[in-house]
């Protein structure tokens, strides 16, 4: 399952996150896969696409960073997957 993780850096300061990342890496538990990330320097946010079997694995990972950022974790589908599922539902009901 894919998730969009939105990190909001505490005090709008990404430096502590960067310093910990350099020391300790991403600190991901087994079963969590990092895909890509983008930084919004104006609003001090990071957007990450990650995969996991369920949201609980990601919540455990976010807890390791909670002293430096607030997290919003949103389950997402690719556009292709979403529209394919819509088509399947349409065919089943109709």
Feature map (PLM): residue ranges:
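Short, electropositive alpha-helical surface patch
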Residues: 57-65
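Conserved catalytic core of Hanks-type protein kinase domains
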Residues: 51-52, 64
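Structural motif
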Residues: 32, 66-69
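Conserved short beta-strand edge segments in small beta-sheet-based binding/regulatory domains
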Residues: 68-79
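Short S/T/G/P-rich N-terminal loop/turn motif that feeds into the first structured element of a domain
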Residues: 1-35, 40-45, 53-57, 77-94
């Amino acid at each position: 399952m894919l998730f969009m993780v939105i990190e909001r850096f505490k005090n709008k300061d990404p430096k502590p996150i960067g310093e910990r990342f350099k020391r300790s890496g991403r600190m991901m538990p087994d079963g969590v896969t990092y895909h890509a990330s983008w930084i919004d320097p104006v609003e001090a946010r990071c957007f990450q696409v990650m995969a996991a079997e369920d949201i609980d694995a990601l919540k455990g990972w976010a807890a390791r960073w909670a002293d430096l950022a607030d997290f919003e974790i949103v389950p997402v589908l690719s556009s292709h997957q979403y529209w394919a599922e819509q088509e399947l539902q349409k065919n089943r009901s109709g």
